[in-house]
């Protein structure tokens, strides 16, 4: 199965970007995380469940919330949503397996802990140009 995820952001439910891998260097992770966090909260308020995906032109954003973290990725809208969601859930499970302290809530909020996470998920990510 080929790589389908372009960019990925992992946010704490309070809006802090703990990890991001973005191909375009002009996109500031903390700025985007604020937008995604607000959008997700808005969706939760309206639908009592949050937003699972949305599209902008030819890009689909897929969102999954687990254990106080929001996982967001984007991909071509030509890729089946179920395939993207399965890949995102696989990454989320890997995140919690590698960093179990964040689940136990004894994490000290140091985002440097996650700086090498890209190496663990590289097989899911489209190569950067």
Question: Which positions does each model-derived feature cover?
Answer:
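Acidic, low-complexity cytosolic segments
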Residues: 2-7, 11-129
């Amino acid at each position: 199965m080929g790589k389908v995820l372009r960019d990925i952001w992992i946010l704490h439910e309070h809006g802090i970007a703990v990890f991001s891998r973005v191909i375009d260097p002009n996109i500031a992770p903390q700025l985007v995380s604020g937008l995604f966090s607000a959008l997700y909260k808005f969706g939760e308020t309206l639908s009592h469940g949050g937003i699972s995906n949305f599209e902008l032109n030819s890009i689909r954003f897929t969102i999954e919330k687990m254990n106080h973290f929001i996982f967001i990725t984007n991909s071509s809208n030509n890729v089946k949503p179920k395939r993207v969601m399965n890949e995102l859930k696989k990454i989320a499970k890997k995140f919690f397996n590698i960093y179990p302290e964040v689940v136990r809530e004894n994490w000290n909020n140091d985002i440097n802990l996650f700086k090498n996470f890209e190496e663990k998920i590289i097989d899911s990510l489209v190569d950067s140009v």
